[in-house]
C-alpha cells in the first residue's frame, strides 16, 4: 500500500470536491487509516476557508483516508465532538444523512462502546453500533449486518457512509427519496 495525500490522489477533481465545503461548512475532518491505528484531525470551520485544512491536507498521507465536510442537522450542535470522522483503534467512519429516532440506536450499542461517545449525533451512535456488530461478526459481516438492521428498523433520509480499517473500505449508498429532510434545499 502506498501513502499519498488527498490532493495528489484526487488530482484536478480535488478543487471541485473542496467547493462542497462551502455548503457543508460546519466542520471538516480527516481520518488517516494506517496499519495499526486511525488518526483523526478535525476542525469546526469550513474547509474552504481554513488555513489549517490546507496545511493538513497537503502534508498528511496514509494508505487510506476519509475526508468529511459536515453540514449539521438542525438541533445538533456544531462542536468538535460532533465533527466527523469518528474513530476507534484502526477503524474510522463518516456519515451523511439522518436516522430517526436516533437515540433508539443507543439500545443496540454494546456497553464497552457506550463510553466512547463524545458528542450527541446520530452519526456517532451509528458508528458505535457498527463497532458492536464488527466485534460480534468481523469487519465486513458486521458492517453488512448493522446496515441491514438500521435499514429495516429505523426511518432515515440516508445512511450514506464510509467505514475504513487497515484492510477494507466499505462505502454505503442508501437513501430514502421519500424521506428527504425538509431543512435542505434541492441541491
What residue spans do the PLM features occupy?
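Conserved short alpha-helical segments that host acidic/polar catalytic motifs at enzyme active sites
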Residues: 1-187
